[in-house]
UniProtKB/Swiss-Prot annotation:
<keyword id="KW-0342">GTP-binding</keyword>
<dbReference type="InterPro" id="IPR005225">
    <property type="entry name" value="Small_GTP-bd"/>
</dbReference>
<comment type="function">
    <text>Required for accurate and efficient protein synthesis under certain stress conditions. May act as a fidelity factor of the translation reaction, by catalyzing a one-codon backward translocation of tRNAs on improperly translocated ribosomes. Back-translocation proceeds from a post-translocation (POST) complex to a pre-translocation (PRE) complex, thus giving elongation factor G a second chance to translocate the tRNAs correctly. Binds to ribosomes in a GTP-dependent manner.</text>
</comment>
<dbReference type="InterPro" id="IPR006297">
    <property type="entry name" value="EF-4"/>
</dbReference>
<dbReference type="GO" id="GO:0003924">
    <property type="term" value="F:GTPase activity"/>
</dbReference>
<dbReference type="GO" id="GO:0043022">
    <property type="term" value="F:ribosome binding"/>
</dbReference>
<keyword id="KW-1003">Cell membrane</keyword>
<dbReference type="InterPro" id="IPR013842">
    <property type="entry name" value="LepA_CTD"/>
</dbReference>
<dbReference type="Pfam" id="PF00679">
    <property type="entry name" value="EFG_C"/>
</dbReference>
<keyword id="KW-0997">Cell inner membrane</keyword>
<feature type="binding site">
    <location>
        <begin position="133"/>
        <end position="136"/>
    </location>
    <ligand>
        <name>GTP</name>
    </ligand>
</feature>
<dbReference type="InterPro" id="IPR027417">
    <property type="entry name" value="P-loop_NTPase"/>
</dbReference>
<protein>
    <recommendedName>
        <fullName>Elongation factor 4</fullName>
        <ecNumber>3.6.5.n1</ecNumber>
    </recommendedName>
</protein>
<feature type="domain" description="tr-type G">
    <location>
        <begin position="4"/>
        <end position="186"/>
    </location>
</feature>
<keyword id="KW-0547">Nucleotide-binding</keyword>
<keyword id="KW-0378">Hydrolase</keyword>
<dbReference type="InterPro" id="IPR035654">
    <property type="entry name" value="LepA_IV"/>
</dbReference>
Amino acid sequence: MSQTLTRNFSIIAHIDHGKSTLADRLIQFCGGLSEREMEAQVLDSMDLEKERGITIKAQTAALAYKAQDGQIYRLNLIDTPGHVDFSYEVSRSLSACEGALLVVDASQGVEAQTVANCYTAIDLGVEVIPVLNKIDLPAADPDRVAEEIEDIVGIDATDAVRASAKTGIGIAEILEVVVKQVPPPRGDENAPLKALIIDSWFDNYVGVVMLVRVVDGVLRPKDKIRFMASGTQYLTEHVGVFTPKSVDRPQLSAGDVGFVIAGIKELKSAQVGDTVTLVDNPAGEPLPGFKKVQSQVFAGLYPVESHDFEALRDALTKLQLNDAALQFEPEVSQALGFGFRCGFLGLLHMDIVQERLEREYDMDLITTAPTVVYEVVQKDGTTINVENPSKLPELSKIEEIREPIITATIFVPEEYVGNVITLCNQKRGVQLDMQYHGKQVMLRYDLPMNEVVMDFFDKLKSTSRGYASLDYEFKEFRAGDLVKLDILVNSEKVDALSLIVHRATSVYRGRELAAKMRELIPRQMFDVAVQAAIGANIIARENVKAMRKNVLAKCYGGDITRKKKLLEKQKAGKRRMKQVGNVEIPQEAFLAILQVSDK
């Protein structure tokens, strides 16, 4: 099929605006799957994706559509994730397209991630087509939302297609608009091969499956290929397309989107955004935009039973096959034993990895509080990255600590603006911009990432009754007045409870945390002191009172010296017990850090 009859497009939308349902309808309309094979959210292959109603991995479908002009077009639909944690995947999916459907819920209006992804599309030169979805809802107000799109995003929405993916209204119109407005791919079949990896995942039977967009050249089975970022070489076995079932093809030529299987054993070789070329006739330079995915949030994962350590290593290694952004390395904690320090893209990513470990691999896990990476400049001029607070050098060796700052874009209805501004100020935010668009307000803030990973998202939702939406991107490392807060139980530091906090809130955080720990640590046969310390200074102390056996119960009357002797004996025993006694710290105590709110 010639390039003039090919259209590559993706769908961008905020979570819950009906992106996956619309993809289902388009596949059904073009006859991609029979009635029997059709199921809800057909492109979301993971159970977790369906349950949470989110798309995590990018998927594609090649559809044949007979347009009103009588021609049969091939439409390549690339489904993108909508969540802020997966924004790099979105930018790769969009760079493989010439057009994008901007799906906006006609009852809710424009939200933060819609805008962020739409700007990414415009920067990449992608033709954006607005679609108003869910017009069958009683609360739908398409005219207001069309105005919002023009006002906030700045694209003409007067002819926006009005559709309802649930009932099937407007699906034919969407396909016609795609054919008319999305430009055909421009690629040279005779040039050296250049193919962009949009996504890759691990299949138990064939190894790594790569989803690619061929930009120039032709890719056939038995070709010798090379990845330009990692430099590794492989021999292709199969090439083909998803309809969304996989169908083998004799070749993929310029403008096509399809899959490549080349007997690759690990995902690290096929990184998202890398360029594939031929060994015999290589391209001069790779496609732009590739970057190695950096972990933003770190947390310790420890097995509850220490003999599960190897099982956890296996589970993480298997997950990494399907999730190149997950990084982990072994670490030892005095309090929790052997475990792993894992790096994630964001809190949702961390949540999903944890849930998949528990669900798919039956692991019982203890998770420490999430932290971010700090840049520490030492007195000798060297700079080190610290992702675990317990690894922070001594204060005497530190020149300054720099924390990661993000720029957050928040959309919120005007009646909740006050609450959101108060919240951002509590989190040490600096306001950059504030714009009113109809009833919506757009706020832009610089916020320390450390404050965001704790509980910012939950609080944002609760102060705005769920209406606020958030998108953020990393900005820079900035020096801050930060200190390390240690928790001591029975005069021993518990490394897994250490935190890096701002000096202004450190005393309050220390008191709150000590009080919380007092409630959670079970009572022992001796007094247990819980202390919060900054360096050598103790800033807060709470006591967990001892349980006491009544040793005088057997003395009926009798001499007072007899009673004193028994009490002294008990006292000496308690003193001895305190010296050798171990205090078991329950899992809830490690999560208590998350619940310590700011003032």
